[in-house]
């Protein structure tokens, strides 16, 4: 059976895959995102940035899989960033930065871009490479100051792209979205399905043995 390797430490991405019948092998990439973004240049299109980050993450775990003896697998790498006012925003990292971002996006709309990369390896060699991005418009509410401060205090928005989540506490402050919900969470199932097809893999081949596939 082909292994499904998730090149991410994201609990949200893992949860999406598990709910969709896939039990991934998790191998976290060590890509220096800031260095790669700098290398791409200030004029790089936002869609190109997130896609190249996803590709780098998928490729980065190849030596780890070789070390671990995983020679037949599909590797999925993802990267999400929020595009607002023409600028890409990743993880805020601190309460002050998250607060500043919420002050600029409350009551407004922004686009969550998620780059996706799928590599297929057979007998240790890359035999398939597909990549693309998804774009979902997110319409934000204007949370009262007390609610926003309470949200910031949880720490949840500090380590997620755009300083919000859709599937957890941050969902209270999202009025609606236009696009794929799973992409906003971090891994778009419709896009991953298409990329898997591009490298010759059907999703049912990857379902965990639970009555849904074998």
UniProtKB/Swiss-Prot annotation:
Tagged with keyword Cytoplasm: yes
Localization per record: Cytoplasm
Function text: Nucleoside triphosphate pyrophosphatase. May have a dual role in cell division arrest and in preventing the incorporation of modified nucleotides into cellular nucleic acids.
This protein's name: Nucleoside triphosphate pyrophosphatase
Enzyme class: hydrolase
Cofactor requirement: a divalent metal cation
EC number: 3.6.1.9
Protein keywords: Cytoplasm, Hydrolase, Nucleotide metabolism
Family: Belongs to the Maf family.
Active site, UniProt feature: 79
GO biological process: nucleotide metabolic process
Cited InterPro entries: ITPase-like_fam, Maf-like
Main location as per UniProt: cytoplasm
HAMAP family in alphabetical order: Maf
Lineage: Bacteria, Bacillati, Actinomycetota, Actinomycetes, Mycobacteriales
Catalysed reaction, written as an equation: a ribonucleoside 5'-triphosphate + H2O = a ribonucleoside 5'-phosphate + diphosphate + H(+); a 2'-deoxyribonucleoside 5'-triphosphate + H2O = a 2'-deoxyribonucleoside 5'-phosphate + diphosphate + H(+)
The organism's place on the tree of life at top rank: Bacteria
GO CC annotation, single: cytoplasm
GO MF terms held by the record: nucleoside triphosphate diphosphatase activity
């Amino acid at each position: 059976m082909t292994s499904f390797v998730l090149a991410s430490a994201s609990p949200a991405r893992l949860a999406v895959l598990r709910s969709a019948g896939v039990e991934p092998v998790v191998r976290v990439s060590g890509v220096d995102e800031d260095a790669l973004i700098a290398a791409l240049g200030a004029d790089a299109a936002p869609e190109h940035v997130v896609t190249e980050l996803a590709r780098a993450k998928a490729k980065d775990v190849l030596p780890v899989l070789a070390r671990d003896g995983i020679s037949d697998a599909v590797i999925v790498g993802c990267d999400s960033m929020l595009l607002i006012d023409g600028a890409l925003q990743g993880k805020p990292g601190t309460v002050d930065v998250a607060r500043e971002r919420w002050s600029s996006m409350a009551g407004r709309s922004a686009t969550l871009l998620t780059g996706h990369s799928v590599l297929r390896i057979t007998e240790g060699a890359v035999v398939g490479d597909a990549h693309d991005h998804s774009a979902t418009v997110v319409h934000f509410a204007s949370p009262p100051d007390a609610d926003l401060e309470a949200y910031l205090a949880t720490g949840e928005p500090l380590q997620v792209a755009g300083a919000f989540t859709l599937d957890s506490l941050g969902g209270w402050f999202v009025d609606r979205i236009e696009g794929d919900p799973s992409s906003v969470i971090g891994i778009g199932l419709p896009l991953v399905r298409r990329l898997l097809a591009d490298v010759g893999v059907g999703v049912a081949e990857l379902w965990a043995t639970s009555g849904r596939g074998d």
